[in-house]
From Swiss-Prot:
UniProt-annotated location(s): Cytoplasm; Cytoplasm, Perinuclear region; Nucleus
Effect of residue 33 to E: Abolishes interaction with HSP90AB1. No effect on interaction with PGR
InterPro entries: ARM-like, ARM-type_fold, TPR-like_helical_dom_sf, TPR_rpt, UCS_central_dom
Record-listed N6-acetyllysine modification sites: 70, 483
Protein name per the record: Protein unc-45 homolog A
Gene: UNC45A
Function, in words: Acts as a co-chaperone for HSP90. Prevents the stimulation of HSP90AB1 ATPase activity by AHSA1. Positive factor in promoting PGR function in the cell. May be necessary for proper folding of myosin (Potential). Necessary for normal cell proliferation. Necessary for normal myotube formation and myosin accumulation during muscle cell development. May play a role in erythropoiesis in stroma cells in the spleen.
TPR repeat placement: 21-54, 58-91, 92-125
Entries under PANTHER family matching the protein: FI21225P1, PROTEIN UNC-45 HOMOLOG A
Sequence positions bearing Phosphothreonine: 15
Amino acid sequence: MTVSGPGTPEPRPATPGASSVEQLRKEGNELFKCGDYGGALAAYTQALGLDATPQDQAVLHRNRAACHLKLEDYDKAETEASKAIEKDGGDVKALYRRSQALEKLGRLDQAVLDLQRCVSLEPKNKVFQEALRNIGGQIQEKVRYMSSTDAKVEQMFQILLDPEEKGTEKKQKASQNLVVLAREDAGAEKIFRSNGVQLLQRLLDMGETDLMLAALRTLVGICSEHQSRTVATLSILGTRRVVSILGVESQAVSLAACHLLQVMFDALKEGVKKGFRGKEGAIIVDPARELKVLISNLLDLLTEVGVSGQGRDNALTLLIKAVPRKSLKDPNNSLTLWVIDQGLKKILEVGGSLQDPPGELAVTANSRMSASILLSKLFDDLKCDAERENFHRLCENYIKSWFEGQGLAGKLRAIQTVSCLLQGPCDAGNRALELSGVMESVIALCASEQEEEQLVAVEALIHAAGKAKRASFITANGVSLLKDLYKCSEKDSIRIRALVGLCKLGSAGGTDFSMKQFAEGSTLKLAKQCRKWLCNDQIDAGTRRWAVEGLAYLTFDADVKEEFVEDAAALKALFQLSRLEERSVLFAVASALVNCTNSYDYEEPDPKMVELAKYAKQHVPEQHPKDKPSFVRARVKKLLAAGVVSAMVCMVKTESPVLTSSCRELLSRVFLALVEEVEDRGTVVAQGGGRALIPLALEGTDVGQTKAAQALAKLTITSNPEMTFPGERIYEVVRPLVSLLHLNCSGLQNFEALMALTNLAGISERLRQKILKEKAVPMIEGYMFEEHEMIRRAATECMCNLAMSKEVQDLFEAQGNDRLKLLVLYSGEDDELLQRAAAGGLAMLTSMRPTLCSRIPQVTTHWLEILQALLLSSNQELQHRGAVVVLNMVEASREIASTLMESEMMEILSVLAKGDHSPVTRAAAACLDKAVEYGLIQPNQDGE
């Protein structure tokens, strides 16, 4: 059978003017045989235009497909063959021709289906069989090729750089695949070695947001934890080019560039992490140089005109993360000193820029706060007075340069810069305030008729009132001015700031009930106005933030706290504001919540010391009656009902430098207060509090981490850890809990950590291994000797659960230690709960390690009395544990069994074996059966 041509008719010349379908078909066949494929195609097309039967139509379409194959027009060949198959599904010629067309089009998976159908219709046709074998081989080769990373990379770049694929789903999928491929080390290396960085540079130059995002995210995979690739990437793209992407208007692109630069910083500072990456392909002589070039470009970006406000904020965020030392124990702060010398003035320029009216530098509502945080981090990273003095000198010189000889605009810029310093390194800010004429200018500008001048001056006055000394000065000189502004100004933005100034001065006494700056009731009036502005949706978020600032100060007063938590609308507005992009409000929100929950540190003063202070006429702070525990508990419940946990979870998720270590500490304090009562913990877990506490416990100040870890411990004790911390998150809880075992933590924190670890150790072997890896066992053993009975008991219970691990069993089995002796002795203590824990540990160990059974008689001469006491206990659990230990000892050695049977133990076991079908009865009976098996005792006549 021939399948390559349309047919084999008798050759005869074409008849001009022939009109019948049959005649035209035969003419087409003749032309096809003569190699005139165009003429044949025309004849078949003409025949189709006549009144052809469905069968004739199928043949004609099939023949047209053969012509298109010869003419190498494979798309049309596939179309014609498909039309023939629609007319006759069993047409093997049409199926074969379509398979040929599909093969040429590269659609091998579809071609093989048609060939398989041909073979099923004509199993003995060798042409079909051979074609199927050939195409099968092609498919295997294509699979091998397509599975190789090189092919993937080449294919994806072809799609991404193809101008005709603009905006297609194919292009989007290729960009996603490229990003995923770069996350694997092998994929990242292939992309890098296939000139991937140069190709990615072309994507960046195209300017399309989606392509730029794909390119930046792919570069993240290439540079992640790899120094040499990072340096090579910076060399190819240009450090300036990479940094400049931060300044684009697109927020998504700017954030992606920020992430890339963060990865580059980490790679340059840390190098390759062993175990995660292979050997580097190049040797880096001095990565510190590349690091400085990168930081230098970031500093230049801060003051570059045309950079977006979001880009400037991202640059500040990168500097905050990259420059200061991670730990003050690291002696090298040279990078900080270099940044102060090279870029302090540039940072101050951002801090002194005004958002409204816009100046030369575009800034956001968060820019000044980010600059303040960076300045604070740099100042805290200094080691000696000489370094701090240099910092002060540079700041003062910069402020003087604007304050002197620059007119009113210069004075405004200088005062704004002072405000930035007061929010960050306040020591530098206070010194700047003492410069000649600065404070006087602040007071004078408060009375200005220009709104922007008043805003700058009033904000500076508010920040200056932070210190008690400064507050006293302002109370004497500026209160009347602030009151006039509050009462007379027509601008809400001025009034609300003046109100915050009054709030701050009114709270200068803190929680001390006896120290009030204003008359009785004044703070309540101020708080009421703050709540009113907070709830006003017509006012912009930036202005409403100041209302929260005011409440953060006023909530030191317990009367204000009580009214605030009763105001559901104000709480709702507060929580909504914390979720907005106005991130600078986070610290004020957290401060207000700390005050409402009384979660700051408070130690009850010694009554004798109080009397002594009164006798010496020293001031003694007094607690407000409404700050007593009953009032605090009521406020906590109202906050929980208002949805405080959900708001705090959103705050913790914030990726912003505004979420400082101090802010995280405040949130940790509030969480700890929220979980104090057992009945409230379910609400906290249900609203996501458990997962929010983990990052708080792993990062922040030491106090904040400890508070968050303690809150985690409380949740782990009273709720199912697998439900509270689902999936892999449960393993992240272990480290914070172990940190509470350190000696610098309180006894309560030690106790709660031990109880929480006990629960975790009872869940799975993987969790026990995690506890062992965190080196918790030596600390737990130490607490087993603690004098406090509850801590000693909790440590013993924890060790009992850990004893299920092979490594812990090895510790007990090792020679030359008293671990086993301690458990035996604790099994004889009067504390029933301690007895139960120790006996449980003994039962576990003797079951898992029979060799320990022979050592029990050696650790103490009172071992037999202790075991007998366990079996004679009125507590079923103690009896059962004791019976299991005895059974393990009997089964371990005939010699030990003989010693036990020669004592009163046999009588005790005999009595217990006659009980009901309880676990104790079964264990006692098993002991006696084993003794009978050894021939140590004889069964009685009843066979018992």
